């Protein structure tokens, strides 16, 4: 009963955010992992313009896995905590190489990704 109320409240009050769009599940996974890494230690309002710019230049998991570090850090510039960007790229490479470009579907595999851990 409480879950229904929470979901109802969310449907009526959720914020419109660029990573909450209708898209394919593969794209949704990419938007989610990029946003989660960017949101570590950073407020939503700060992340949004960086997120949008990042996606213009690095639009999917495969391109993230292959991007040169210099370009990666250029598109991350201003967010700080550059280890997040480096871990995001390492995670993307592992996802592409070991999981056919899809996020692992279990908790233990997710925790093996650099920069992913308990909340």
What are the roles of these predicted feature ranges?
Residues 1-113, 119:
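N-terminal polyanion-binding entry modules of DNA glycosylases/AP lyases
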């Amino acid at each position: 009963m409480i879950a229904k109320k929470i979901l109802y409240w969310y449907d009526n009050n959720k914020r419109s955010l660029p990573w909450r769009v209708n898209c394919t599940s593969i794209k949704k996974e990419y938007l989610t992992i990029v946003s989660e890494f960017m949101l570590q230690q950073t407020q939503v309002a700060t992340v949004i313009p960086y997120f949008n710019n990042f996606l213009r230049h690095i639009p999917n998991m495969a391109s993230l896995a292959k991007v040169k570090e210099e370009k990666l850090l250029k598109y991350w510039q201003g967010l700080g905590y550059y280890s997040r960007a480096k871990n995001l790229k390492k995670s993307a490479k592992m996802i592409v190489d070991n999981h056919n470009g899809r996020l692992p579907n279990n908790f233990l595999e997710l925790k093996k990704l650099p920069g992913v851990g308990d909340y």
